[in-house]
Structures are given as structure tokens and as C-alpha cells.
């Protein structure tokens, strides 16, 4: 019957509290007025708590929190504001797994059953003591958990504001600040409603225990005052004013720069006011603007010599003649030539600026000085519309700012400073080093050139071998018949390197017949074929000749000398 509690573990601190196994309702005859008052207060409190738990705004904020954490996990996984938001998410998940909403709904359904039943004045159905005690325990645990959630929200708020002072991820930090503040407000209202629900629940438990005592948590005494149970964290949230953060001084200036109110906008100069007032004066001085719309206006006809007063649509409908096209072409050519002449000085200015910034970067000794130089470089590159260089320098600025804060705590980062300086100098000297769009075509061109260079000597070798094989003597064929016959008897053909021995033999040979020329050419073009194929070719080429067997033997001897 009673809930088993582990030694040292408090029952309100558990995520899952087991339900009572006995009957959940109790019929009371002739209920007292105090019982009616308690049940009415409990039903009202349960309705308010369920309304705040099921609010769509709270669900939307929780969904936004989960999506922000999921989308920025890889980029901001080790940042302190991100970790604080992770703690907020853990508290929300624990609150969901407690099933506080379900237990409160069950209790409200048991209390509202008396209104539907007839004759409820004589007999009253109330929840049993174990059901009320389970809800009381969940209310205590929910209040403690909500206090922890509010603390995590405050911590995340302060860390995001501090991170906002670094001028990094400004939009994301603003979103996180607004999200955390809204979650803090919503859950503070939920905590207030849970605290107001605890007192009528405790009085209802006392009334039910006096009618039919059936305790569920025997080793735990429910506190009479929940504020004493919650401790100083409750006073920090509700009664003590939160102190202003010291790190928000620079943040307010930054936010004022980003979001200026209409009252804070700078006043216009007299020159701008005069410029704005001139066209209005011209409009008033124009006689056409002073026409009374209530009277009929006489349309005055224009003569041919008079020019149109305002916008004429027929000028756009007429086609341009040859003279106009020639003038436009001349203007376009002149603009192109002007661009070519102005291209060299812009490149010279860029190289001069890059050399100056590299010298200044090399002289820096701390990350604070380096970040200042990077900021100046970013401003210059953005003014010259160098997007790739600006993005590269922006990423380096983020890293240097982080190392600057680490360096301010007393750590020496000389190696990291040197590495960052070298990477920045290389980027500035080589121009668009970070852009990867230029590298693949260069690699393809170089590979194509290497392949074309390697193919040319192969063609030369083939032509020289053809020329040399055409010079084959008749006297050496007889000397090589014996070696070819021996290899035929053994039945194995040993293949070795063809080029060196074949070249030496072919250089010593004399001119052959016309028939042998055709056969050797077939060997060089199709070197992967076997001896039977070559013999078939020789027979097809020399089927009219009487001594085909001798020529075939001579050809076999030549290939044997070559090692084929």
C-alpha cells in the first residue's frame, strides 16, 4: 500500500511516483461546509494549473527552444550560453516526464463527478487520501523543479547578454535572450499557481484523513507552509529584486545602436530640411497644382511647335536609329577602355594596402591588437566588395576575440598568435586564397598537359620501331631457326623485356622482303595476340606465294629473338 522510498532519496525528487493500488474515491454522507469549500478551491486551482500547462504559447516557446538548440549544436556546442540552454531543456523534459498535468486532470475529474450525479447534496464522492497525497507530492516536486528552471533561465540570460557584448552572433543571441525571458515569465506564473493550489489540497487531505484515514507516504510529513519548504530560492524569485548585471552596460549601447526609437533618432540638419522643402515649394509655385477639382478644367490644345510639358509615352515607342546605336556602342567601348586603364591602379592600391596591413599584423604582440587590425581589414575589404576575404577575416576575428578573453585571464598563447598571424598574412598577400573556385580548372589543365607530354614519346617510339623493323636481313633468319625449334619443342614461351634486346637485334639487321614488312607491322600494332593469330595473318598475306612455310618459320625466329 505505502510507497517504497529509497534511503536517502526524498519522494518529491523522483520523476515517477507510483500510483496507489486501492480505491481512488470515497463516498461521504452529509459532507461538512469546510469540505465543500476545500473541493471548490481545489477544482478552481486545478483548472488554472491545467490551463497554464496546456497553453499554446508555452508549447510554441518550448518548440522554438528545441529547434534553436538542434540547429546550433555543431556550431555552439561548447559555448556557455548554449550549455545553459541545454540545462533549461533538461528541466522542461523532466517536468514533462513527471506527468503533473495528468495527475491534476484526474483529480479534477474526480471532484467534478459530484456535479453530474443526482442527489449530490446527501452523498458526496471525494478522492481518497492516497490520490490526494500523490498530487501533493507532485506539486512539491514541480515547485522545486520550476525554481531550478527559473534559475537556469536567469543563468542563460546573463551568459547570452555577456556573449552579446562580444558582438558575436548578435541575431542569435537576441533570439535566445527573448526566448529565455519569455520562458521565465511563463513558468513563473505556473509556479505561482502551483503554490496557490498547495494550501487547499493540504486542507482537503486533512478533511479526508479525518473521515477515513488511509496514509500513502508514512515516512514523510507534508509541510504546512510551502514557502519554508522551498527555501531562499523562492524569496529570490518573488520578493527580492534581481540586481542589474554589470556586463550589460556595453550591451545597452549596442542595442541602442541596433534598435533606435523614433524619439532617439538624430535630428535632421538644416540643409536636409531645405532640400526637402525645395520640391514642395516648386509644387506649390506650379500653376497646374493650384487647380480646383470642383470646377471644370479647360483642356488647352498644344501646337506642333510647342514641346510637351511632362512625360511623353511616344518617346519609348519609337525605335532607335543607326546613329543612336552607334553612339551607344561608342560609349560602351569608351567605358570598357576606361575600366582597363583604371584596373591597374586599383590592383596597385590593393597590394600596397595588403603590404601595410601585413607589416602591422606582424608587429602585434597580443590578440587585442590583432583583433583591432582584423577589424580594420574587414572594413576595407567590405568597402572594396571582397566578399571571400571579408568572410575569412570575419571568422578569424571571432577566433581572435575568444583568444583575447582567454589571454586576459593570464594565459600565454604565443604559438596560437603566431599561427593566426601567418594565416592572415598569407590570405592578405595572396589575395583571394580562400576562394576554391579557381583551383579545380588549374589542376585539370596541369593533368592534361602531363598526359599530352607523355603521349608524344610513345608515338615516336612506335614510328622508330616500325622503321627499324623494316630493316631485317635474310642471313640472320637461318641462324635463329635452331633456337625457335628448341622453344617449340619445350612448349613454353618465356616473355621478358622486349625493348632493349629487340632494339639491339633490329639495329644489326639488314633490309627484309616486302612480305615480312607487313607481318612485323601487324605484330607492333597488336602485340597482345598469340602466335596462332600471327601465323593466320601471314598465311592470308602470302597465300599466293609458294614458300609460305619458310616465311612463317622466319617470322617465328624474328619474334623469338625479340622475346615474344
Swiss-Prot record:
Main subcellular location of this protein, as a coarse class: nucleus
Coiled-coil spans in chain: none
Comp. bias (Basic residues): 442-459
Localization in the cell: Nucleus; Nucleus, Nucleolus
Listed GO biological process terms: negative regulation of neuron differentiation; positive regulation of Notch signaling pathway
Keywords, ordered alphabetically: Developmental protein, Nucleus
Segments of skewed composition (Polar residues): 460-473
Keyword field contains Lipid biosynthesis: no
Phenotype upon gene inactivation: Knockout embryos die before preimplantation.
InterPro entries for the chain: Nepro-associated (IPR052835), Nepro_N (IPR027951)
UniProt superkingdom: Eukaryota
Keyword Nucleus: yes
A GO CC term assigned to this protein in UniProt: nucleus
Region (Disordered): 431-495
Region (Nuclear localization signal): 442-460
Similarity section: Belongs to the nepro family.
Protein function: May play a role in cortex development as part of the Notch signaling pathway. Downstream of Notch may repress the expression of proneural genes and inhibit neuronal differentiation thereby maintaining neural progenitors. May also play a role in preimplentation embryo development.
PANTHER family: NUCLEOLUS AND NEURAL PROGENITOR PROTEIN
Protein name as it appears in the record: Nucleolus and neural progenitor protein
